């Protein structure tokens, strides 16, 4: 006698309301909370956020907010930045495991030893780094303002640039400066296949290939436009082209499609037939986790005060130099 085994069904979480959008809106009013979301978040999180942006825009919003609670739909270093700027506010990250491969590629102890080899160098650190690395830096930058920041530093001042080597190379090309680079990288932006991108450009000869500067030089050399996520979004709206191959995390395509619904956006392919160009850390955040974080006021981002204070100054320098 045979019996049919039914597939195991996951029980419905009784603590999750059916209408999450309404429940989150109610909690937002109750807590006087603001939801900040990065472009790489899932579309449903982007749609409920009060502000969607790149690292620079999110930092500016975090610095300016009057909310009592900041819910950061992004990764750990972004929520840390919000806490550095707002020590008296409650900063929530829906999933504390939402880390960053680029930030992880620059361990504080190793970077301290690296920095000690260049005592006369100014340290410019990409915002995609831990609070400890920010605390060891002189100025923070983002992909939106890295070139602008470096151009404001006297030419006779030697510079360490950390942690992203690809962004560092791009800044060197744009500024003509010789930077000492920390050899870190982002797993997402290093997975794009030059060969497959060339094939796509042959398949879509009228398409524009646009790319984030965290991509490798072999990929960037084919791009008709290179810029931060916000810059890519703006360019795709203003360009006369109607088809784009986009080399960055594909979460940005949700906003591109909303802003230009009649245009076509094709995610740049990865080396393997996988979703490797989706950031696994960004995708840990879900609408359900966002709701529970607000309801439970946890997980909360906390920092040792001496680290926070030391990290604040280079961020404030960036915000001032970005005006």
Swiss-Prot record:
UniProt cross-references to HAMAP family, sorted A to Z: NadA_type2
Name of the gene: nadA
Family: Belongs to the quinolinate synthase family. Type 2 subfamily.
GO function terms (MF aspect): 4 iron, 4 sulfur cluster binding; metal ion binding; quinolinate synthetase A activity
Residue positions binding iminosuccinate: 38, 55, 126-128, 143, 212-214, 229
Residues involved in [4Fe-4S] cluster binding: 100, 186, 279
Gene Ontology terms describing biological process: 'de novo' NAD biosynthetic process from L-aspartate
Signal peptide as annotated in the record: none
Gene3D superfamilies, A to Z: NadA-like
Cystine connections: none
Cofactor(s) annotated in UniProt: [4Fe-4S] cluster
Compartment annotation: Cytoplasm
Protein known as: Quinolinate synthase
Biological pathway: Cofactor biosynthesis; NAD(+) biosynthesis; quinolinate from iminoaspartate: step 1/1
